[in-house]
Amino acid sequence: EHGYLLDKYTGCKVWCVINNESCNGECNKRRGGYYGYCYFWKLACYCQGARKSELWNYKTNKCKS
C-alpha cells in the first residue's frame, strides 16, 4: 500500500518539513515499506509499500491534536 504514515498515538499523519531522510527511515525501518519521503505540499511523510494498518486514512482515522 502507499499513503501517508499514521501516528497511532494521535491519529494524525506523521508530519515533516523537508526531511526525506527521517520519513524514509520511518517508512523502511519501522513501518515495513520500501521508500518514504516528505511530501512538501502536505508537510507529511508519504510511504510506499507499507502495511495498510500503518497508513493514515481520511475515513477511519481522526486526528486528536
From Swiss-Prot:
Q: Which GO terms describe its biological process?
A: defense response
Q: Where is this chain's protein located in or outside the cell?
A: Secreted
**In which tissues is this gene expressed?**
Expressed by the venom gland.
User: What's the superkingdom here?
Assistant: Eukaryota
Covalent S-S links between cysteines: C12-C63, C16-C38, C23-C45, C27-C47
One Gene Ontology CC term in the entry: extracellular region
Q: Which GO molecular function annotation, any one, does this entry have?
A: sodium channel inhibitor activity
The chain residues annotated with the modification Serine amide are S65
Q: Which sequence positions carry the modification called Pyrrolidone carboxylic acid (Glu)?
A: E1
* Primary location recorded for the protein, binned into one broad class: secreted
Instruction: Write out the entry's keywords from A to Z.
Output: Amidation, Disulfide bond, Ion channel impairing toxin, Neurotoxin, Pyrrolidone carboxylic acid, Secreted, Toxin, Voltage-gated sodium channel impairing toxin
- What PROSITE patterns does UniProt report for this protein, alphabetically? LCN_CSAB
Which residue intervals define the domain LCN-type CS-alpha/beta in the entry? 1-64
What job does the chain carry out?
Has a toxic effect on insects and mammals. On German cockroach larvae, it provokes contraction, paralysis and lethality. Intracerebroventricular injection into mice causes severe neurotoxic symptoms. It fully competes with the binding of the iodinated Css4 (AC P60266) on rat brain synaptosomes, with moderate affinity and in a concentration-dependent manner (EC(50)=25 nM). It may act on both site 3 and site 4 of voltage-gated sodium channels.
Write out the domain note.
Has the structural arrangement of an alpha-helix connected to antiparallel beta-sheets by disulfide bonds (CS-alpha/beta).
- Give the family, as the similarity comment puts it: Belongs to the long (4 C-C) scorpion toxin superfamily. Sodium channel inhibitor family.
User: What else is noted?
Assistant: Negative results: does not inhibit the binding of iodinated Css2 (AC P08900) and iodinated Ts1 (AC P15226) to their specific antibodies.
Name under which the protein is recorded: Beta-toxin Am IT
